[in-house]
UniProtKB/Swiss-Prot annotation:
Any one GO molecular-function label of the UniProt entry: translation elongation factor activity
GO CC terms in record: plasma membrane
Membrane topology value: Peripheral membrane protein
Subcellular location: Cell inner membrane
UniProt protein name: Elongation factor 4
Positions contributing to GTP binding: 17-22, 134-137
tr-type G domain residues: 5-187
Keyword list, A-Z: Cell inner membrane, Cell membrane, GTP-binding, Hydrolase, Membrane, Nucleotide-binding, Protein biosynthesis
InterPro entries: EF-4, EFG_III/V, EFG_V-like, EFTu-like_2, G_TR_CS, LepA_C_sf, LepA_CTD, LepA_IV
GO biological process, one term: positive regulation of translation
E.C. code: 3.6.5.n1
Protein source organism: Rickettsia rickettsii (strain Sheila Smith)
Pfam families per the UniProt record, alphabetical: EFG_C, GTP_EFTU, GTP_EFTU_D2, LepA_C
Function: Required for accurate and efficient protein synthesis under certain stress conditions. May act as a fidelity factor of the translation reaction, by catalyzing a one-codon backward translocation of tRNAs on improperly translocated ribosomes. Back-translocation proceeds from a post-translocation (POST) complex to a pre-translocation (PRE) complex, thus giving elongation factor G a second chance to translocate the tRNAs correctly. Binds to ribosomes in a GTP-dependent manner.
Length: 600
């Protein structure tokens, strides 16, 4: 098996819904990786949520055995990578494990923003790229137009593009021949000392952590003592193998191969993706380039709707963390919502997926506070802080300046929706950097504050472009900004869970919208309830929920006026006491609806 010239390591790059997982299914079927009765749609997407949303979240790998037309047997290692921007780092290290890529483009839709980001990463990794145009059987397919578009935008030669329909299986053998003939084999091993790239890891209840690796130099075998270079932790390898996509145990993984190993590792957090694995006795001198720890970008609070579920939530988060090292959380408490967790995510899709998995896999009913980002605070006394929880924001008098993160967004949109998209970006405080046309699609590059993106930007972009716009972003810089903490008071009590950090120009509009929303959601009481929005000590908006009138005289039929007066005085005293000590219960539904307000 140590014939490197017969190995091909490749990944599939595609935008969401362009047919990446379907093509992977056809390749597995064609090479006999699974029997026809074992095939299911999107074999490599192991989570239900991946199949339902049509997205890939975790990188998966599969070894295919293909007998080519030249008579040789080739071993093809397919790396199915995530396509969404939140998982860009997972994509980058999956690409680093390969020598080539299949660029799959939907011939009815053309190039999307997401595809661009991943193709440029593949080119940076010196990948050979084979262009595959999919969905050829659809009436709206325009392969020649899409080829021209790809040449104009990406600049790669499209004359040898492979035309296929993954769904109906047309052209799959052409794809396999192109992989064998056009993609290069792994480079010859330069040393016998083990050097392997940690591509991904997940938790198996029986084996502990399973680690996906690409062996660059040397070999990895059972009972070897290995060392992770980023964490300096040492383990003994228990099992070595590969996926077809079933698990196969083998004795050794040679240079150029992609496979997995287990080593009684207890948690995924110990396995940093992109780390270098080497032999403990003879370590390699230099780690592989490109490793960087993943830092959360978006934060929010997760609280159980029923406080008795707290321990269940704690256990569930710990289990999710086993499989997702980029997800972080810490305990926090709120006077309005009780005890919960402050969680950090790679982006909004990551947040949605974690939320959905908590409710689906662990049967939890949760309240999510408004998402926020990391702000840099420069204090007057010279201290510098980084905060992501509005409750931690110091008094404005003590702050010298505040900085917020900005992103660089690339948006591809059909010509007729351009006006609506430009006005949305302007409304979100965006600055246009570039604007170009490719055929009948516009490509615009905007600089936008991340704070404005985390609410509802993606949903609104999709609705104002009828779903045709695609959007990709990367972190750019931190810039000084006029930010304020918008507080919500109910009966003069601050509701910390509804506090947010907003730009001063948006504070009044957002404060009014929240007050109006809460007025409709909080049930009436026997006293007037004041709902106020404030910046510091200044009230910027107010709504009042009028009191219910409880008729205490209904049981007095006629009779003495002093009896009625006595009852009215008693009610008056009770209302006074309620105003003094009364705690207004805000229902959970009010929180959930108020937090969904975005920037309506």
């Amino acid at each position: 098996m140590n014939h490197q010239k017969y190995i091909r390591n490749f990944s599939i790059i595609a935008h969401i819904d362009h047919g990446k997982s379907t093509l992977a299914d056809r390749l597995i079927e064609h090479c006999g990786g699974l029997q026809a009765r074992e095939m299911s749609q999107q074999v490599l997407d192991s989570m239900d949520i991946e199949k339902e949303r049509g997205i890939t979240i975790k990188a998966q790998t599969v070894r295919l055995v293909y007998k080519a037309k030249d008579g040789n047997t080739y071993y093809l290692n397919l790396m199915d990578t995530p396509g969404h921007v939140d998982f860009a780092y997972e994509v980058s290290r999956s690409l680093a494990a390969c020598e080539g890529s299949l660029l799959v483009v939907d011939s009815t839709q053309g190039v999307e923003a997401q595809t661009l980001a991943n193709v440029y990463q593949a080119i940076e990794n010196d990948h050979e790229i084979v262009l595959v145009l999919n969905k050829l059987d659809l009436p709206a397919s325009e392969p020649e137009q899409v080829k021209q578009q790809i040449e104009d935008i990406i600049g790669i030669d499209t004359s040898e593009a492979v035309l296929i329909s993954a769904k109906s299986g047309i052209g799959i053998d052409l794809v396999l021949e192109a992989i064998v003939s056009k993609l290069p084999p792994p480079k010859e091993s330069s040393s016998d000392i083990l050097k392997a790239l940690l591509v991904d890891s997940w938790y198996d209840p029986y084996l502990g952590v399973v680690i996906l690796v690409r062996v660059i130099d040397g070999y990895l075998r059972k009972n070897m003592r290995i060392k992770m270079m980023a964490t300096n932790s040492v383990y003994t390898v228990e099992n070595v193998g590969y996926f077809t996509p079933k698990k196969h145990i083998s004795d050794v993984l040679h240079a150029g191969e992609i496979g997995f190993f287990t080593a009684a590792i207890k948690q995924v957090a110990d396995c940093k993706v992109g780390d270098t694995i080497t032999d403990e006795k003879k370590p390699c001198e230099q780690a592989l380039p490109g490793f960087k720890p993943q830092l959360p970008v978006v934060f929010c609070g997760l609280y159980p709707t029923d406080s008795s579920e707290f321990e269940h939530l704690k256990d569930s988060l710990a289990k999710l963390r086993l499989n997702d090292a980029s997800f972080e959380y810490e305990m926090e408490s709120s006077s309005a919502l009780g005890v919960g967790f402050r969680c950090g995510f790679l982006g909004l899709l990551h947040l949605e997926i974690i939320q959905e998995r908590l409710s689906r896999e662990f049967n939890l009913d949760l309240i999510t506070t408004a998402p926020s980002v990391v702000y840099k605070i420069h204090m007057r006394d010279g201290e510098n802080l980084e905060i992501h929880n509005p409750a931690d924001l110091p008094d404005l008098q003590k702050i010298e300046s505040m900085e917020e993160p900005w992103i660089k967004a690339t948006i591809m949109v059909p010509d007729e929706f351009l006006g609506a998209v430009l006005s949305l970006c302007t409304e979100k405080r965006g600055m246009q950097l570039d604007h170009s046309y490719i055929a009948n699609r516009a490509k615009i590059i905007y600089k936008l504050p991340l704070n404005e993106i985390v609410y509802d930007f993606y949903d609104r972009l999709k609705s104002c472009s009828k779903g045709y716009a695609s959007f990709e972003w990367q972190m750019d810089v931190y810039e000084p900004s006029e930010l304020v903490k918008l507080g919500i008071l109910v009966n003069a009590e601050v509701v910390d869970a509804l506090s947010t950090i907003v730009h001063r120009s948006r504070a009044e509009q957002r404060g009014r919208a929240l007050c109006v929303r809460l007025k409709d959601l909080i049930p009436r009481q026997q006293i007037d309830i004041a709902i106020q929005a404030s910046i510091g000590s200044r009230i910027i908006a107010r709504e009042t929920i009028k009191a219910l009138r409880k008729d205490v005289l209904s049981k007095c039929y006629g009779g003495d006026i002093s009896r009625k007066r006595k009852l009215l005085e008693k009610q008056k005293a009770g209302k006074k006491r309620m105003r003094q000590y009364g705690n207004i219960e805000i229902p959970q539904s009010a929180f959930i609806a108020a937090l969904k307000i975005g920037d309506e």
